[in-house]
Amino acid sequence: MKHARRFSFGLIVLLPFVAGLSGCVTPLGRGYRFDQREIEILPVLSDPPHLHVLVSDRITNIGNQPLDSLVAEMPAGPTFGMQNLRVTVEGEDAEPHLIPAPAVRLYRIPFDPAWTMSEASQQHSVVFEYDLAPQPGGRGTISVSADDYHLGDPTAFPVWQTPAGVFSKGGRAPLQMTLHVEALPGQLLAALGEEIVPGKNSSTGERVFKIATDDPTPYVVAGRYVEQVVSASGHTVAFWTFAPLDAATAQTAAHRLGASFETFDHFFGSAPPGTNTIRIVETKAALPAEFGVAGEPGGSSFPGGVILDARTIAGGLASESGMQLEEYELARTWFGWMVRPRPEAQILMGRGVGLFGVALAAEARGGAKERQQVVMEFLSRYEEARTKAADRPLIEPATGYTREQRVSSGYKAALFFVALEDAAGNERLRRAMRHLVRATSGSDVGDDELRSAVEEETGRDFGEFFRTWLNHPGIPAEFLKRYSEDGSAVPTASR
């Protein structure tokens, strides 16, 4: 039965330490050291427009036996139309073998000849080359046009899988990483990392960024934008739009965004490096709405920033619906970028946490009454969505879900976190979420890690709570009773 397996949250912290100790002695299993990664992203304005991606890795065999292959997770799902994949090993073409797996695309990369143990100090070259193109039905994390382009998705680049085995070594983060991107003439550009080759003096438009090992996945946004910078709520907010914003609109939006970002920083943990400036970026691509009516404008995210459909800008950047969309995407800086939800937890830990962030920001802004209003709004939207598609279990890959199923399950996931906050208490859940981000940053997480963190902070068993919410359809009657139509709510734990 789900959740029968339990472990201490402290084990999440101890396991990397124990694994590190084994590096001091003779290796006991297969393994590799991920020495270096260099990523190049080039916009190609062909028909159809796409991004050409070149990923060059350097890897060393540090295990106790030869390595004849490694497995890499590649971009998959409706967001990407990955085409023209080519892999070379030591400069020679290698035929990647697709491994059947639910919700992810795994390839086994063969090494011929195998990397022997005698080459323990020798770095080996593996190069991936492929094209990414926006696809209908995707989340809008990639776009390419003559005026702008962006790539903001944690799953856009190969992810090496540690070999199977108790004593195996590996990891997804390289010791060194650089990002090469191109800004077309007249474009503003933002990317992850510290710029080491300034692009203003470059005749080619190439920009090079050095990425720290504890940074999230690389991203890039670029376009021929008008920049408006506003300081509000202790933060700097930069608006990159194709036409100037009304000054009052920009000021109103910046004030709320700065306050909301501060709330997330307090509740989820310190924001990643490079997010001192919050960026709100317009794109000419039609981004699909994850919630609301099909065909409405949506958004996307990158660490410390939001990408908005031009229709959202035109419809009111500082409107309530626009601000909630921006807060939802900003919250995904933590759960989506810093912490990557596992495939079966994408709706719970991705959409659910993002919408829960909207409720957190509302309470910080207007107290319990404002939070109550947002929760009632979520509940109403959930009930409306259920008339079109019943919600699914919150822990399973969303592969094959209809849009309506994603919407109803997404709102239920948000209400789960509201109920969890009521049950655990605001301060204890805050500590649990901060510990979760700190201990698992850069890793895949799911409901097991969340439950362990909450139980560690509260000293209580949340097994039945998780089973009721995650495995069964509908909203528990106890929650509906507390959040009745008259607007009253009776928390079960001190806030």
What role is predicted for each listed range?
Residues D68-A94, P174-G186:
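Solvent-exposed beta-hairpin/edge-strand motifs
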Residues P100-A101, I109-W115, S125-Y225:
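Extended, low-hydrophobicity, Ser/Thr/Pro/Gly-biased non-transmembrane segments
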Residues V55-D57, V226-Q346, G357:
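Juxtacatalytic substrate-recognition/specificity segment
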Residues I59-G63:
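Asparagine-centered strand-capping/turn motif at beta-strand->loop junctions
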Residues L28-R30, V53-R58, Q83-E90, D131-G137, ...:
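Beta/coil-rich, acidic/histidine-enriched accessory regions frequently appended to metallopeptidases
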Residues G23-H52, S484-A489:
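N-terminal, polar/Ser/Thr-rich
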Residues G298-G299, S321, A345-A423, T440, ...:
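Acidic/His/Gly-enriched intrinsically disordered linker/tail segments
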Residues P27-G29, P78-T116, G137, P288-E296:
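Solvent-exposed beta-strand/loop surfaces of large extracellular or lumenal domains
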